[in-house]
From Swiss-Prot:
Keywords tagged on the record: ATP-binding, Cell membrane, Glycoprotein, Ion transport, Membrane, Mitochondrion, Nucleotide-binding, Sodium, Sodium transport, Symport, Transmembrane, Transmembrane helix, Transport
Main location: membrane
GO CC annotation: apical plasma membrane; basal plasma membrane; mitochondrial membrane; mitochondrion; neuronal cell body
BP term (GO), one: carnitine metabolic process
Transmembrane segments: 21-41, 143-163, 172-192, 198-218, 233-253, 258-278, 340-360, 374-394, 401-421, 429-449, 463-483, 489-509
Activity modulation notes: Allosterically activated by intracellular ATP.
CDD domains: MFS_SLC22A4_5_OCTN1_2 (cd17376)
Record-given protein name: Solute carrier family 22 member 4
Misc. comment: Mediates the Na(+)-independent and pH-dependent bidirectional transport of xenobiotic tetraethylammonium (TEA).
Amino acid sequence: MRDYDEVIAFLGDWGPFQRLIFFLLSASIIPNGFNGMSVVFLAGTPEHRCLVPHTVNLSSAWRNHSIPLETKDGRQVPQSCRRYRLATIANFSALGLEPGLDVDLEQLEQESCLDGWEYSKDVFLSTIVTEWNLVCEDDWKTPLTTSLFFVGVLCGSFVSGQLSDRFGRKKVLFATMAVQTGFSFVQIFSTNWEMFTVLFAIVGMGQISNYVVAFILGTEILSKSVRILFSTLGVCTFFAIGYMVLPLFAYFIRDWRMLLLALTLPGLFCVPLWWFIPESPRWLISQRRFEEAEQIIQKAAKMNGIMAPAVIFDPLELQELNSLKQQKVFILDLFKTRNIATITVMSVMLWMLTSVGYFALSLNVPNLHGDVYLNCFLSGLIEVPAYFTAWLLLRTLPRRYIIAGVLFWGGGVLLLVQVVPEDYNFVSIGLVMLGKFGVTSAFSMLYVFTAELYPTLVRNMAVGITSMASRVGSIIAPYFVYLGAYNRLLPYILMGSLTVLIGIITLFFPESFGVTLPENLEQMQKVRGFRCGKKSTVSMDREENPKVLITAF
């Protein structure tokens, strides 16, 4: 009995049909790149200080000294959330007293920004922060905005697979594109922060659903050899292209509503893709819609210039194939033995902390020295060589060492940021980008590594659980950025330390390179450096002489 890949092998691997599907599905990911990171500019916090109304009768000297100073990054700057009590300094101004000469400013009573704030417009003309004053006592709302977007991403990752299984890959792909584009457009008309945030969470649901379904559709249509290229370089590289486009839009459009409109419009260009992207033949077969699946393959063969067999799918053969029942599995199977539980816990930590590093570095771009638009572009650009490097390393080297190696690289250079003199800002930016390179490379390898560690029976569940852990990491990441308001170096110290720590933990994983994928839980390799309880002589013999074939990658 042949499987699906054997049935359609006559199509070849890289004909016009496969190239069309590869590039169209990859291109559909571009809006995900700029929508996913748009919060960097939509919720940017410009320099600000308390507003001193023009109606207050102050001399020019007292107006210039109405804001207390504080030391920040080694220089004196006006405080962002405090001012001298206006009634007091107005009296001093009326008496003709001079600040700093007749009055000791350090002894003056201070008050909060009772009349609002004035914001610098050097970088942003308007953001949701300036529109709804998400600063000082309300500055906690800014990271929460981003976290709730990723909560939407987490929810979307739950439902996207189930929806595509029920209604089909193609319909759900375009429906979730519509959700992402439509609700992004509705966000433009937000009247308050609460409305914006709820809509942003829905956009997050649409964004990840679009990504996941495009990923599934590509892996089901493309052949095995192209499937790896699509999942590692295709979708990831086009996501990075969208990421790089974002700062170009933001540079020329500095009003958040107009920027959001500009980022929404490209989603309309995905509409014509409906007539070029087919439904997944695999899904159609699973729904017993054999004729529709055969029509798609016939069109693909015609596009590739290949003569297709008269009958491609034998209903009896496929019915027999679909009738095979898999053993039911439960989440507790990932913790069935001490060894499996250890691998699962370490995998969850690896995914979550790597995700924290990736998203914290991406979202922390506004806090870097220099031009925020250039830094954001570089942050997206550095991902392209990171993905290519990961792809090349996965082809030739053991998984544990390459993942640990790039994590050590990323964490190490992030820890070096704290020793760079303040005058060498370009060095700090370079180190941060090198750190992003390492973390991004590691992140892109995790799907392959996790899939190779677990047996077929629980592989999808394991990847799903660890992927959920990465969503939790993305929810936490904005608060690492938030710590930068207290100390500019603190996020890098924490991210660098955690990245090095998870790199060390990676060395305790079993190696999966060149090893046949396990088919059941008993074939899973043992964690290195851990004792998994007492073993019988028989079980010890099995571990010393495992029945696992070593194959070339």
